[in-house]
């Protein structure tokens, strides 16, 4: 009972702290100048993490302290960015969008809290607006909704083509961006605590390997998002797979399976409404059986290729929005994970040090004490102070010496 009373009291204190909350020095909008991000007139370096579960846990006021704990641990290490989902759709527990245009207010307030807490501590957010995958009601849920309304849809990739589904997505964009945060009283589209939106988490369109379908959708939706919210940066949420616009890269860098997903790193980001490039590095997912030396060699080629293309072809910053090494990888060791982090961070730092296009990296994923239901093979608890956490902290120290804006 004493524990419950303490949790309730903590939730009340946290909620009261947002009344009349003022912007911290790090709370300007992040913008872009060439291949660099800018915050308050200085280069802004992204050293961060993924925590897709923030809104889910914050839906219950009694568990919001877990978000506070994660952000406190992150800021103590100097981390500057968190990436979290802006979707949870369908007939699932704590859904955000329960049906097209219908939203659960309590879950929305969970997302409100995550944004408000990020603002309070000076962390910037990157928020994807839908999932390519079925998890948490991805594009499949939109297709199912359309089918239930009599639309003739045969594939989950009809998400990109069906006009009714496209309107569902646009309505979600409008609802999200026009939402007024119940804690900060600021509309999402006017909230500088958010750095950027992503159109989708890991967009793919396997029914059209030419890439034309996905390209048309990105073009249309990027312009639409910018018409609703011109304040924030926008990216695709891309994994970084190359397409027909760069056949040499496609042949030399792509995992073989990636040649069938209809994505094109160069073409999909070479749009005025897209402000920066996104990529992931899932070497443990794409190449399960690689030995460690081959894995590190791939990471080096993959990152350096994308950094070079962002610098010379796209002339935009690029963020590595997901990377890590899962404990379910064959022959996994903590030392191997540390090597993946060190290799990744070193490549990012070399580019950043020269004023290059590599703007930073976000590892997958952070969890907090008490959220073991979200724990996965790649999860990291920052308070554990593992050797990997020490590497994360050292990267922050090195990036900080470059003299830009590092967050609060």
Curated annotation (Swiss-Prot):
Keyword Ribonucleoprotein, does the record have it?
Answer: no
Q: Does the keyword Secreted feature in the UniProt annotation?
A: yes
Reaction catalysed?
Random hydrolysis of (1->4)-beta-D-mannosidic linkages in mannans, galactomannans and glucomannans
The enzyme's first-digit EC class, named in words, is: hydrolase
Glycan attachment points: 73
Q: Could you provide one GO biological process annotation from this protein's UniProt record?
A: polysaccharide catabolic process
Q: Which residues form the signal peptide?
A: 1-23
Which residues does the Swiss-Prot or TrEMBL record annotate as the active site? 202 (proton donor), 322 (nucleophile)
Q: What molecular function terms (GO) are annotated for this protein? A: mannan endo-1,4-beta-mannosidase activity
Primary location: secreted
Residues involved in substrate binding: 85, 201, 364
Subcellular location field: Secreted
Q: Which family does it belong to?
A: Belongs to the glycosyl hydrolase 5 (cellulase A) family.
Q: What is this protein called?
A: Putative mannan endo-1,4-beta-mannosidase P
Q: Where is the organism placed in the taxonomic lineage, from the top?
A: Eukaryota, Viridiplantae, Streptophyta, Embryophyta, Tracheophyta
């Amino acid at each position: 009972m004493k524990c419950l009373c303490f949790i309730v009291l903590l939730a009340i204190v946290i909620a009261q702290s947002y009344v009349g909350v003022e912007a911290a020095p790090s709370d300007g909008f992040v913008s872009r100048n060439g291949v660099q991000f800018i915050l308050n007139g200085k280069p802004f370096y992204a050293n961060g993490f993924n925590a897709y579960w923030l809104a889910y846990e914050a839906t219950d006021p009694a568990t919001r302290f877990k978000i506070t704990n994660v952000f406190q641990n992150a800021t103590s290490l100097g981390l500057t960015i968190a990436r979290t989902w802006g979707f949870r759709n369908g007939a699932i527990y704590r859904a955000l969008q329960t049906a097209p245009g219908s939203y659960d207010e309590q879950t929305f307030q969970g997302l409100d809290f995550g944004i408000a807490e990020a603002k309070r501590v000076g962390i910037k957010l990157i928020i994807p607006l839908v999932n390519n995958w079925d998890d948490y009601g991805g594009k499949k849920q939109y297709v199912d909704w359309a089918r239930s309304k009599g639309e003739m849809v045969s594939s989950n990739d009809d998400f990109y083509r069906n006009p009714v589904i496209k309107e569902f997505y646009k309505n979600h964009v409008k609802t999200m961006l026009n939402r007024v945060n119940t804690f900060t009283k600021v509309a999402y589209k006017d909230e500088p605590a958010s750095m950027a939106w992503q159109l989708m988490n890991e967009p793919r369109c396997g029914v059209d390997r030419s890439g034309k379908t996905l390209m048309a959708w990105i073009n249309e939706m990027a312009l639409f998002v910018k018409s609703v919210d011109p304040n924030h940066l926008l990216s695709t949420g891309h994994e970084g797979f190359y397409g027909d616009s760069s056949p040499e890269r496609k042949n030399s860098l792509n995992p073989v399976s990636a040649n069938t997903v209809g994505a094109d790193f160069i073409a999909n980001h070479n749009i005025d409404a897209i402000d920066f490039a996104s990529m992931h590095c899932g070497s443990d997912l794409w190449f399960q059986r690689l030995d460690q030396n081959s894995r590190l060699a791939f990471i080096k080629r993959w990152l350096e290729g994308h950094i070079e293309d962002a610098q010379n072809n796209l002339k935009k910053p690029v963020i590595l929005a997901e990377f890590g090494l899962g404990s379910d990888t064959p022959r996994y060791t903590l030392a191997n994970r540390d090597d993946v982090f060190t290799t990744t961070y070193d490549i990012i730092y070399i580019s950043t040090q020269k004023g290059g296009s590599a703007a930073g990296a976000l590892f997958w994923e952070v969890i907090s004490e008490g959220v073991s239901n979200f724990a996965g093979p790649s999860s990291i608890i920052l308070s554990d102070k593992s050797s990997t956490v020490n590497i994360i902290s050292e990267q922050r120290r090195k990036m900080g010496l470059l003299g830009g804006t590092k967050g609060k």
